A protein has these predicted regions:
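Conserved segment of winged-helix/HTH DNA-binding domains
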Residues: 50-56, 60-62
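Short catalytic micro-motifs in class I SAM-dependent methyltransferases
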Residues: 5, 24, 127
Length: 135
């Protein structure tokens, strides 16, 4: 069995789509629109085969959890894997230079990964990770 896709509600569908395309090489399918429900979405595919659905609909309330400082029950982040620690460092620099907050790292974790954590345009937590390798 495999995880088919994850989904994120957003108030800025095009901004979110462009973020995942530009920084994470997501490949969008054509926008789906249901005018009756005032719903729109994109499915983005990634090199690994994973997919992410970005959704927007009138009336969906904003997330009131503090996703920057606090942790909460439920899904807390998405992680993107890269091949090398240099790629982790490069992606952190690219996002920081584009104005995105780096919450932590790049750093070695206690369970053998090298990663950093950032936020997407909707303040959803994202990680970029690889296995730690001694130099």
């Amino acid at each position: 069995m495999s995880l088919e896709h994850g989904a994120i509600w957003t108030e800025q569908l095009e901004v979110s789509k462009n973020f995942y395309v530009k920084f994470f090489d997501g490949v969008p399918k054509e926008k789906y629109t249901n005018e009756k429900k005032q719903f729109q979405s994109y499915f983005l595919s990634f090199q690994s085969g994973a997919r992410l659905e970005l959704m927007q609909m009138v009336g969906v309330p904003a997330n009131t959890n503090d996703r920057v400082v606090a942790q909460h029950q439920g899904i807390i982040h998405l992680a993107f894997g890269v091949d090398t620690m240099d790629q982790v460092d490069e992606k952190a620099k690219q996002l920081a230079n584009a104005g995105f907050l780096i919450l932590s790292g790049p750093r070695k974790t206690g369970d053998g990964y090298y990663e950093f954590e950032t936020l997407d345009p909707d303040n959803n937590r994202l990680g970029v990770t690889t296995f730690f390798k001694e130099s």
